[in-house]
């Protein structure tokens, strides 16, 4: 047996985080248990979990401090409320039947425990660590999470300590606001007035990047830390280099021109895979987007069907979106761009578009928030998990 459990409970300085492994005494966990208790480390000395002095819990449990214990008060916290909480959680779990079918005498547990150096409240330290230990134990024995739960939750997740959410494009449709601007004050106004919405993407347009460079991404990120940000470089050469530059700047996606050589596009895609950002292929002036996608050995994340600003008086034509999706695979998203107005939103959606790219209809509006909200309403989107009350799950 080799089981792994994890849990985070509480908030503030007393927040508790438990990582544990559980296994047989004769196995890898038992060996690690013996090594830890016999090979002490300064500031991280492991201690047996005891309900009170002279009453260790079963299964035998070793507590390992994650944070270096430098001060006397930290040692007192670890040998006081933390030790009692972990031991009581294990003992109560036996009483509650959590260990049903487990040989208690042949099992050992190692629990790595986090206590922040500024934690003070003994009551909270005890209660949070008690809850975290019980939850981590149950999760380990339940083999939590299963793969289905992991895949369902991974893009909904916001790390409690990190403080911001990294957006991914898993729940179309989306509204992408293209900031084809050359004025920083105008950009800031747009960023401040756009609504906070899970289905809104922010694009640093080509003119904006040409005027201020990729460093403008950091300014956008400062104002909209949770946004999905696209850098519209329209790359024609050095695809891997410009993809890496975009990732380093903090953007979530880079736009490569569909007119670029196939090798350039493929190198860009390969580098975005390495850095964890999206590749958008802009098909502006590309006669046969389907053929381009078919030629690619590695497929992009998004294909953008794009009419240029200079030809926006021509009729709307989205091309064969189903054929593009077939060529690009089931995960491919298709965006439509160029003079998008509210009156064509539903037509674009019916044609199969996942992302609608809107520029001046929003950025040049006197009421930017209202204009964006009207487009979002046309898309009939709902905030992700808006009505979900989150605890741990």
Swiss-Prot record:
Protein function: Catalyzes the condensation of formaldehyde with tetrahydromethanopterin (H(4)MPT) to 5,10-methylenetetrahydromethanopterin. Catalyzes the reversible formation of ribulose-5-phosphate and formaldehyde from 3-hexulose-6-phosphate.
Protein name (record): Bifunctional enzyme Fae/Hps
InterPro entries: Aldolase_TIM (IPR013785), Fae/Hps (IPR020868), HCHO-activating_enzyme (IPR014826), HCHO-activating_enzyme_sf (IPR037075), HPS/KGPDC (IPR041710), OMPdeCOase_dom (IPR001754), Ribosomal_Su5_D2-typ_SF (IPR020568), RibuloseP-bd_barrel (IPR011060)
Entries under SUPFAM superfamilies matching the protein: Ribosomal protein S5 domain 2-like, Ribulose-phoshate binding barrel
Gene: fae-hps
Pfam families, A to Z: Fae, OMPdecase
Region of interest: 3-hexulose-6-phosphate synthase: 162-393
Positions annotated to bind substrate: 19, 48, 66, 68, 83
Region (Formaldehyde-activating enzyme): 1-161
Residues at the catalytic site: 17
Gene Ontology MF: a single term: hydro-lyase activity
Keywords of this entry: Carbohydrate metabolism, Lyase, Multifunctional enzyme
Family: In the N-terminal section; belongs to the formaldehyde-activating enzyme family.
Catalyzed chemical reaction(s): 5,6,7,8-tetrahydromethanopterin + formaldehyde = 5,10-methylenetetrahydromethanopterin + H2O; D-ribulose 5-phosphate + formaldehyde = D-arabino-hex-3-ulose 6-phosphate
E.C. numbers: 4.2.1.147, 4.1.2.43
Involved pathway(s): Carbohydrate biosynthesis; D-ribose 5-phosphate biosynthesis
GO terms under biological process: 'de novo' pyrimidine nucleobase biosynthetic process; carbohydrate biosynthetic process; L-ascorbic acid catabolic process
């Amino acid at each position: 047996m080799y089981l792994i459990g994890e849990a985070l409970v509480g908030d503030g300085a007393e927040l508790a985080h438990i990582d544990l492994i559980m296994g047989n005494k004769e196995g890898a966990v038992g060996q690690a248990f013996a090594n830890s208790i016999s090979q002490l480390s300064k500031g991280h000395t492991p201690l047996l979990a005891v309900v009170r002095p002279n009453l260790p819990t079963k299964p035998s449990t070793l507590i390992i401090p994650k944070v270096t214990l430098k001060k006397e008060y930290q040692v007192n916290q670890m040998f006081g409320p933390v030790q009692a909480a972990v031991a009581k959680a294990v003992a109560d779990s036996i009483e509650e039947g959590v260990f049903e079918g487990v040989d208690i005498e042949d099992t050992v547990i190692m629990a790595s425990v986090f206590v922040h150096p500024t934690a003070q409240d003994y009551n909270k330290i005890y209660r949070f660590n008690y809850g975290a230990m019980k939850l981590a134990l149950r999760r380990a024995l339940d083999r939590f999470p299963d793969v289905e739960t992991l895949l369902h939750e991974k893009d909904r997740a916001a790390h409690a300590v990190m403080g911001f959410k990294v957006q991914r494009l898993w729940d179309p449709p989306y509204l992408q606001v293209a900031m084809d601007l050359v004025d920083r004050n105008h950009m800031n106004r747009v960023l401040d007035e756009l609504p906070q919405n899970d289905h809104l993407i922010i694009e640093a347009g080509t003119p904006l990047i040409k005027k201020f460079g990729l460093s403008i991404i950091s300014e956008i990120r400062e104002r909209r830390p949770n946004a999905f940000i696209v850098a519209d470089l329209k790359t024609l050469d050095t695809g891997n280099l410009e993809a890496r530059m975009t990732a380093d700047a903090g953007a979530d996606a880079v736009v490569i021109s569909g007119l670029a050589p196939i090798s350039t596009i493929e190198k860009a895609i390969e580098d975005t895979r390495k850095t964890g950002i999206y590749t958008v292929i802009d098909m502006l002036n590309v006669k046969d987007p389907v053929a381009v996608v078919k030629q690619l050995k590695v497929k992009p994340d998004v294909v953008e069907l794009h009419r240029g600003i200079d030809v926006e008086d021509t009729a709307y034509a989205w091309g064969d979106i189903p054929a593009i999706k077939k060529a690009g695979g089931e995960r491919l998203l298709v965006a439509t761009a160029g003079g998008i107005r509210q009156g064509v939103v539903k037509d674009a959606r019916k044609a199969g578009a996942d992302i609608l790219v809107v520029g001046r209809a929003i950025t040049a509006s006197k009421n930017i928030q209202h204009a964006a909200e009207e487009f979002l309403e046309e898309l009939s989107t709902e905030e992700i998990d808006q009505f979900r009350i989150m605890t741990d799950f």
